[in-house]
């Protein structure tokens, strides 16, 4: 499958998305970055402990892809900037980068403490409480910051792994 040609021919992201078959623990793939950066975002259910990227690429042969980043399924739908932030925050090159064939695979999924060399404590995503978001929204004009903008906390809430700072 040549992603550059497929992206040019298919109008909707959903059509391109359906070209990939779930396999090796990968539940979904996003090709938003394939043409420009030769990168795939691969989404994995949190219950999946090990991802077999070789099986995924064996069943979904792609040309031109140089990098694949694994994310928790809950990150699906985040913007490119948000995924970049998540990848930088949730990966350690010494532990989370492998090469499968010609593709660099970065594991940016949330880390389970003590599993596969992960630290005993791992930080949770930081979000403001709903009450705090509502309070800031109600007083936004007082702060003189211009037009009201949506809090990113609402978008990131689905990434929480527990109600504590570390899990």
Placement of each model-derived feature along the sequence:
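Charged, compositionally biased interaction regions
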Residues: 1-167
């Amino acid at each position: 499958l040549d992603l550059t040609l497929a992206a040019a021919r298919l109008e909707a992201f959903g059509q391109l998305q359906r070209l990939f078959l779930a396999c090796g623990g990968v539940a979904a793939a996003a090709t938003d970055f394939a043409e420009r950066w030769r990168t795939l975002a691969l989404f994995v259910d949190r219950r999946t402990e090990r991802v077999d990227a070789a099986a995924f690429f064996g069943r979904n042969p792609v040309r031109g892809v140089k990098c694949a980043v694994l994310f928790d399924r809950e990150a699906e739908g985040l913007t490119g900037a948000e995924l970049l932030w998540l990848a930088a925050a949730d990966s350690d090159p010494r532990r989370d980068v492998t090469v499968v064939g010609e593709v660099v695979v970065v594991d940016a999924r949330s880390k389970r403490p003590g599993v596969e060399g992960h630290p005993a404590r791992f930080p949770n995503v930081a979000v403001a409480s709903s009450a705090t978001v509502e309070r800031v929204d109600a007083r936004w004009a007082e702060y003189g910051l211009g037009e009201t903008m949506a809090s990113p906390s609402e978008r990131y809430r689905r990434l929480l792994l527990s109600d504590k700072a570390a899990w």
